[in-house]
Amino acid sequence: EYSKHPDTLWAPWRLSYIKGNDDTAVLPDPDRWRPGADKSCFLCRAAALPESYDRDIGVVARTDQSVVILNRYPYTNGHLLIAPLQHQATLPEIDASVLLDLQQLLAIWCQRLTRTLEAQGFNIGLNLGQVAGAGVPGHLHWHLVPRWPGDVNFMTSVAGTRVIPQALDDLWNQLRSCT
């Protein structure tokens, strides 16, 4: 009986993630990969491609040591990944100046997301190793997830569904203009 089932919330953009499709595969290979890069790693690709591809890959900011990129499969609107440019899997591998840069970017982007999206809180996470849930176990990165009262984050844990109110392309425009 239909009344026993909850309403359906369609999220067709998730299918490419579930199937393991990499829609960045249509991008050209960088002219020069960074030393130690993994050519199958989307974070290494983002680090190596020129800024002219930032919109295509979702890069909203770069420093000489780090990159800030939109999560293509976000938990909430504004979900960012903050990663070192180098393909490194563990904290001890990362130089202290890079760690400082990453932490400063976390603080800066908390402020920017608060101002731009009116975020009222954040979940900040780092999954080290595949057994800890790292989707890209060889290239560590922080998740910066903005939160709001009533943001229905329960949907992820209860129904495996996320409700994102804004297209990634629109969000990229908004976040690039706040820098």
Could you say what each language-model-derived stretch is?
Residues H79-P84, G129-F154:
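Histidine-centered divalent-metal-coordination microenvironment in nucleic-acid enzymes
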Residues C41, V68, P84, L102, ...:
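Divalent metal-coordination and catalytic microenvironments
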Residues E1-H5, L9-D22, R147-T179:
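C-terminal helix-cap and adjacent tail motif
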Residues E1-N77:
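Active-site microenvironments that recognize anionic phosphate/pyrophosphate groups
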Residues L117-A132:
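A short glycine-rich, hydrophobically flanked beta-strand micro-motif that places a catalytic Asp/Glu
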Residues L80-Q104, S157-I164:
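Short histidine-centered catalytic/ligand-binding loop motif
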Residues I94-A119, D169-R176:
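Long, well-ordered alpha-helical scaffolding segments within enzyme catalytic domains
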Residues A46, N71-Y73, L85-H87, N127-G129:
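Histidine- and/or cysteine-centered catalytic micro-motif in compact active-site loops
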